[in-house]
Structure formats: structure tokens, C-alpha cells
Amino acid sequence: MKKEFMKKIYKSITLVATILSLSSCGNDWLDRKPADGIPSEDAITNYNDALTARTGMYDGIQGNSNSTSYYGARMFYYGDVRAEDMQARTQGMRSSSCYEMRYTVDDAPNMWNIPYNVVRRANRLIQAINEKKVTDATEAQIGKIYSEALVVRALVHFDLVRIYGMPYTADNGASLGVPVILKPLERNDLPSRNTVAEVYTQVIRDLTDAINSGYLAKDKTQGYINEWAAKALLTRVYLTKGDNENALKVAEDIITNSPYKLWTNEEYVAAWSKISGVHSNEMLFEIAITGSTDWTDREGIAYLYNEDGYADVIATKKFLDLLNEDPKDVRLGVFLAPTTKDFQKLYGTNTVFLNKYPADGLSDLRYNNVPLLRLSEVYLNAAEAAAKLGNQNDKAVKYLDAIVKRANPANTVQGTIVTVDRVLLERRKELIGEGHRFFDAMRNNETIVRYTSKEDQGWQQALKEEVRSFNRDFYKTLLPIPQNEIDANPAMKDQQNIGY
């Protein structure tokens, strides 16, 4: 299988031209330099160059103190504050635009350039290996880097299509998604938007190629993508696409065969610290931050969510009321009450601050790792997919019960019919602060209700009526394509999202 995979990757570059729609003018995003430690397009000529480019690719996912437009912070709070369980504070300057949904074509959170720059970095690695520029390493070493780059490319395209395209389940992927980019673009390359379905096809192809290659590590690899992380992403993709049979199948493979296990009830609160002895048990993939040269500093998600940082984002009263329905739910332990007088005046003793990104042994929360894929999500993916299949209630009960009983061993869903709504409720409780809720609601066509009157407003600020309660038909559930990209690319001239 591995040799067949290597033959395939050397041939795959010839397929690129059939996927891209190209024109002949300059493009704004192409003005960015690679910035991945490799100074030119021709510089990946040996294995050490490839390792350096690989590091740059992973660094791009995380970002740094000057660039948190992806998983450094924005991808998380984009999925949190646009729903009903987390909110920007009145003074939340960084997340308030997403929370209030007050963006326009000329003033919107930019989730375009940085992710596509990560695609560029992945494609440079893929192209160099396709062109046999890396020959001083074993087939396994080369195949591993190549496969990781495929997974990264899939991750970014999947995120982009969820941000700028309608949910696949809305119209079976017929609407416009984002450009599928499979090679480093030149200045005369101007891709148009592919359909949502075409993007998903490529994402699934990249993930399955990487998994089937046999080159991805099967053991735990902190800070790097392994086979189980790729499969965890694949089950998320299948679930979002509405392919519940495959979502369940892949999730069960991870649960049964991977070296990962759920944190116990006793471990749960402390396990969020990366220096706890059990932290890695659940973390299938996270960006490891080892020092101040590769951190997101005060612009990272840990600093934004913590009272000792910017305290930019807090839990809503609506969510805390939900979680407090069970006073023995262990997840209450990852929320903290204010300790400063100013915040106590605003929120009293309410535990509004999420502590899933705590300080490590250096007592500095800026060193906290950036988690992307966790085993609890895989269990909930399995439960949701099983519930949707209709004839798999035993499995829906099994996987949901693992999360419910972990939260409070006295609780169970045994002996019940597990509904999709019940799974989604548990997802809200378990995955808060990890960037999921908004996307969960969109793919399931749920209505997000933040508040409808002053009586249920809690401590949320006054919002325009249109963003107090909405579903995926509301045009601002999609971000606008940045206007400078539209202006620079004639191929996308008439492809702006509806409403903008």
C-alpha cells in the first residue's frame, strides 16, 4: 500500500490543473511571502528543508502574537461567541465584531488570508515531494511529512468552507464554497470559488489518502498530526457533510483502536493543564507551545478567555443556568468566578470565566497549548451519527453515556431513546469554549436564541434584533469574501456571498 501511495503522490500534481479555474491577473493573497522558514519556492531540496517547511506549516495553524487569525484565537471564538453559550464582554474589543455580527465587506474578521497562507505552505511541501526534490530520506520519512501536509490542507479547506460557504446539509453542497487550491499559486493564477460539494470531495480525498498511506504515526505525537488525529478530523467532516454512516464508522475505529482514552471524572478539571499527567490522554492533536518564540502571547485564546488576561470572552448566563441544573457536573469545575472588584460588580459570584486554557508550571497562561481535536468530541460525533441513523440507538446510548457519566457518575442515558437534540445539548456542555457550538447549530439547522427580551438577556449587551435569534438562513452566518480579494480577482467578481 505504501509503495502504491508513493507512486500516487508523484502523479497527483498532474491533476491540479483540472480543479483550478485560472485567469491572468494579480491576486492580493499572492503578495504574501511564504514566511515558513524557506526563503524561496525552490528552496525545499532536501530532508532538512522539508522539516523546516513542516515546522512553518504547523506554525501557520497556530499563528503568533501578530497573527492570530486562525487557531491562535479567532477560529475558537468565531465558533463560540456567534452562538448562545459564550459572549464578548462590552469591552471585548477582539471578539465583539463576531459576537455582534456587525461586519461588512470592508470590515469583517479576516479568516481568509492566514488560512490560505497555511494551504500555501502545505502545498509547497506536497509539490516538492511530488517533484522528487527530497531524496535524502527514507520513503517512510518522506511519506509521513507528505501525509501530514495533506491533512493540514484538508483541515484548512474544511474550515474555510464552513466559514464562507453554506452548510453542506442545506442544499447538498450545491452552493458556492471556497477556491480549492492544490498547488502554490503564481501571480497569474486566479481561482474561482468551487462548490461546497467540490470542497468536501477534496477534503475527504486528502484525508483518506493520508490515512490510507500508512505513513502517519499510530502512537501519540504531541504537536504533530498522527493517524488518529486525521481520522478524528475525518469523522468531523463526515458528520458535517451528513454522511452519518461513515462518521460513526470512523469514530468507532478511533474509540476502539487508538491509544487515547477519556479523562475520568476525577481527572477532568486538572487535566486541562498541559503539565498534568493525563492531559495527553484525550488530546488527539494540539499545537504545542514550548516557549516565547512560538507563542501567541497576549493575543492567544488562553489570554482572551481568562480573567488574568484580557477577559474578552465570558460564558453567558443562559449557559451557566443550563450547566448549573446539575450542581455535581464536574464541568462546573472549569469555570471560575471573578476575583477582582470590577468584575465582581458586573457578574457577582457567577462563574463566567472559562478555565480550559489554564496556566502551566511557568504560571503563565500564554504558554498553554492550542487544542484542535479531542477524544470527547469523537464520542459525541459517534453518538450524534448513531442517533441520526435511526437504527443504532444502542450505540447512541453507549457513546453519549460515556460523556454523561463522566460528567456525573450518578447520571445515565441508559434505557432511553437518544435523540439528536439530546446529543447536541451534551455537546454544548462538553465542548464549550472549543469553537464548536455555532457550527453544530448551522449543520443541524438549529435556531440560535441568545435572548428575546430583557428578562432573559442576562449580562449580554444590547444586540440588534436580527442577531438575537437566527438560523442559517440569516446571511451573516457566513462571512463576506474580503473585498480586496474580490477586487483583485476577476474570477470571483460575481461570487460574493448573498447579502453583502
Give residue ranges: language-model regions.
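Bacterial Sec-dependent N-terminal signal peptides
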Residues: 1-4, 8, 18-48, 203, ...
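Short, surface-exposed recognition loops and adjoining beta-strand edges that mediate ligand/DNA contacts
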Residues: 41, 68-88, 160, 165-174, ...
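Extended ligand-binding clefts on enzyme/binding-domain cores
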Residues: 47, 52, 198, 241-242, ...
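Inward-facing hydrophobic residues that define packing positions of alpha-helical scaffold repeats
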Residues: 54, 119-122, 200, 207, ...
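Conserved, well-structured interaction surfaces
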Residues: 91-164, 194, 212-216, 365-370, ...
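TPR-repeat structural position
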Residues: 200, 244, 392-393
